[in-house]
């Protein structure tokens, strides 16, 4: 984050604010981890709300503060009232308003200052402040830098747990090429804040309910190979979803 952006951010938060945090539709661990980390960072001195465009996988309910996430599809009236009061909107882990689905029009019509933090390539020019770096492993790693640039001393176990979870999820437990020496250093610093590495791994990867295992079985059973290419693809049919009581996020991590 360059000095001009840092100065703009510090000026914005020089007084109490009404902050809205928005992840992308069907948010994953990186999106929700980013939202919750910023929620905990600003919540003591500001009014802060997280509004998800829709439902997210219940696997992520272990994240500290997840009980405070509002679902726009379930509670439109309450969410729209919050939008009317908001003066700062963070959009996290997406670079195009279309990824916010049913919230995109509310964001574009709002008079609030919009801050994008995202690690995907080619961001749209919708935000007042754009913090974008496609070389970063995850949005959570960027959020860590964002928080450190304002007040690193405020990072506690809750913030560290949320950020670490997002980084681990988006890097495949530090296996993917996006993992850098800096990513590992950030992970180390988060562990120093008491992050329970084993518990997070278990929650993310060994938390399969019976119906989700059956859904995975259906996905494997539907494998198709493209002849002449080292490519295999699959599909999950409407019937598979109905039989296995499918909910958004149940297929998270099946394909990478």
Regions found by a protein language model. Give the residues of each.
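An acidic intrinsically disordered interaction segment
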Residues: 1-8, 105-114, 134-143
